Structure formats: structure tokens, C-alpha cells
Regions:
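Conserved acetyl-CoA-binding loop-helix of GNAT-fold acetyltransferases
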Residues: 94-107, 131
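Residue-level recognition of the GNAT/N-acetyltransferase active site
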Residues: 14, 84, 89, 120-122
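Conserved acetyl-CoA binding element of GNAT-fold acetyltransferases
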Residues: 79-91, 99
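Conserved beta-hairpin
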Residues: 61-74
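A short beta-loop-alpha structural element at the N-terminal edge
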Residues: 8-23
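C-terminal "cap" of GNAT-fold acetyltransferases
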Residues: 115, 120-124, 132, 142-163
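Conserved GNAT-fold acetyl-CoA-binding loop/helix
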Residues: 22, 26-52
């Protein structure tokens, strides 16, 4: 467990975190994506981040959680070379927590001898990842229902080893 600031603590995901992580992801999807994506796309995001997927990613990768005063405020996962499920509770966004989580996930990737990370960025997240040095590899458009498209970006970043 690592103290980030006087109020924040980061640690590895435990299975006992599952309900809170799923609730955080669902809430963040509802507040951040509903304004930019049509309803079926929001439903698609909910299905993509269901409990079995969260458990599988945590078991095969590196998932972290961030707490403040005992309340979960953020989570992020690296599964192999892919970053997934980086979510910060809406009330806690724009405080550097997402950037801190990405630094933690990138550091763990370097420790695992991974030199490049990739991710799929939603429309609201694209600028965040660009600021962190990720580059757009491709623009994607997936029709989840007639006339309802999931637009997103495949992005990647070469990690600089400290050596």
C-alpha cells in the first residue's frame, strides 16, 4: 500500500474490492459517457466492464485501486501490454489521480519488462491520454446498434526505461 497524498492511498486490487469497483465503473460510465455516446453504446460499455471481466483482468494483470477516507475513488488495470478500465469517480476527476494511476501502471509495466503499452480511448478520454504521451494509432467506429456508433481511438506509448 502506498500513500499518495494526505488523503489518497493506492494499492493492488483485492477480490473484496469487486463490488465497489463495478459500482465506480458503472457510475463513471453513466456520468461521463452518456453525454457523448448514444444509449446503446453506453449499454455496450456497461457490458464490456461486467464483473467477470473485471475479475479476469485483475487475475491476469495488474489492477490498482485508489481510496480516500475508505471510499474507492479510482481504479485502473494493465493486462499484458494493454491498459484497461481507468476510471476516476466524477467528483474526483481533474485532481491528478488518473495521471498518477497511469504512472503507476506504466512503472509496473517497465518492471515487467514491457516497453510499449496500448489502450482503447473513449471520446472523453482521448485528450487525457494525449497529454500523457500516448499517440493515436487508429480511429475506430463500431456500430453497436443501427445508427448507434461507438467511436474510439486505439492509442499506444513507448515507455522510457529509467536506466
Amino acid at each position: 500500500m502506498k500513500k499518495l497524498a494526505s488523503e489518497l492511498t493506492v494499492r493492488r486490487f483485492r477480490e473484496s474490492d469487486l463490488d465497489e469497483v463495478c459500482e465506480l465503473v458503472r457510475e463513471t460510465i453513466d456520468t461521463s459517457y452518456a453525454a457523448v455516446y448514444p444509449p446503446r453504446v453506453v449499454d455496450f460499455f456497461h457490458q464490456y466492464h461486467e464483473r467477470p471481466v473485471v475479475i479476469a483482468d485483475a487475475a491476469s494483470g495488474h489492477t490498482i485501486v485508489v481510496h480516500s477516507g475508505g471510499k474507492l475513488v479510482a481504479t485502473g488495470t494493465r493486462a499484458g501490454t494493454t491498459v484497461r478500465r481507468v476510471f476516476v469517480r466524477s467528483a474526483w476527476q481533474r485532481r491528478g489521480i488518473g495521471q498518477m494511476m497511469m504512472a503507476e501502471l506504466e512503472s509496473a509495466a517497465l518492471e515487467a519488462k514491457i516497453e510499449r503499452l496500448d489502450l482503447s480511448a473513449s471520446l472523453p478520454a482521448k485528450e487525457f491520454y494525449l497529454r500523457l504521451g500516448y499517440e493515436v494509432v487508429s480511429e475506430e467506429d463500431y456500430e453497436v446498434a443501427p445508427g448507434q456508433h461507438l467511436e474510439y481511438y486505439e492509442m499506444a506509448k513507448a515507455l522510457a526505461s529509467a536506466g
